[in-house]
Amino acid sequence: MPVKKKRKSGVAAAAAEDGGLKKCKISSYCRSQPPARLISGEEHFSSKKCLAWFYEYAGPDEVVGPEGMEKFCEDIGVEPENIIMLVLAWKLEAESMGFFTKEEWLKGMTSLQCDCTEKLQNKFDFLRSQLNDISSFKNIYRYAFDFARDKDQRSLDIDTAKSMLALLLGRTWPLFSVFYQYLEQSKYRVMNKDQWYNVLEFSRTVHADLSNYDEDGAWPVLLDEFVEWHKVRQAS
């Protein structure tokens, strides 16, 4: 989860600066770290301990903001852009990228039964496993739209959309790099929720060679234009 300053996606900023997918450094791996300390079954979850853990990162407004989030990521050994942070935010039902409120933290960490760094590190495999479950991944993908958008906007700006799509689909969708290139040169400056939802459906149902693409289907114009653009490129 990118650390968001002035409500701007850090991943999106990186993509805009680097100018393309090849240089958009989005990680699904943890930085090198010592193994998490084994937690014995006798160490039960403590709400008091969880709250004290929250205050290690929260500011005077009782919110973990950009600076606290950077320290939190450093302590747990995960880059802010790591997809684990997106899954964690989903589990905490966090509303805004780069911020955890006290209520979100306590509710989410209670659900995960985590009241310290080591317990959360021991949950990393579980958090990753949510990405392999079709239903959970769909929920995470849909959650990412509202999580990443500026709250005064109904759509995602296209740079943020490209970065979040790279995070979520970049390693699994064979056509992703082509779709990314299409978005790079397209007229689109935002992506709305319907388009966002349909990109996932398209990636799951349409073959990489587009052989089963239905021109009369109810796809958004954005995807119709992508298919047309891709076919023209292939023909030339």
From Swiss-Prot:
> Coiled-coil ranges per the record?
none
Q: Which residues form the DCUN1 domain?
A: 45-231
- Per the record, GO CC terms? cytoplasm; nucleus; spindle; ubiquitin ligase complex
- Keyword field contains Nucleus: yes
Q: Where in the cell is it found?
A: Nucleus; Cytoplasm, Cytoskeleton, Spindle
One Gene Ontology molecular-function label: ubiquitin-like protein binding
**Superkingdom classification of source:** Eukaryota
Entry-linked InterPro entries:
DCN-prot, DCN1-like_PONY, PONY_dom
Sum up the protein's function in the record's words: Contributes to the neddylation of all cullins by transferring NEDD8 from N-terminally acetylated NEDD8-conjugating E2s enzyme to different cullin C-terminal domain-RBX complexes which is necessary for the activation of cullin-RING E3 ubiquitin ligases (CRLs). May play a role in DNA damage response and may participate in cell proliferation and anchorage-independent cell growth.
Q: What is known of its domains?
A: The DCUN1 domain, also known as PONY domain, mediates the interaction with different cullins. The DCUN1 domain mediates the interaction with the N-terminally acetylated NEDD8-conjugating E2s enzyme leading to the NEDD8 transfer from N-terminally acetylated NEDD8-conjugating E2s enzyme to different cullin C-terminal domain-RBX complexes; the neddylation efficiency correlates with the DCUN1D5-cullin and DCUN1D5-E2 interaction affinities.
**Name of the protein this chain belongs to:** DCN1-like protein 5
Q: Per the UniProt entry, what species is this protein from, by scientific name? A: Bos taurus
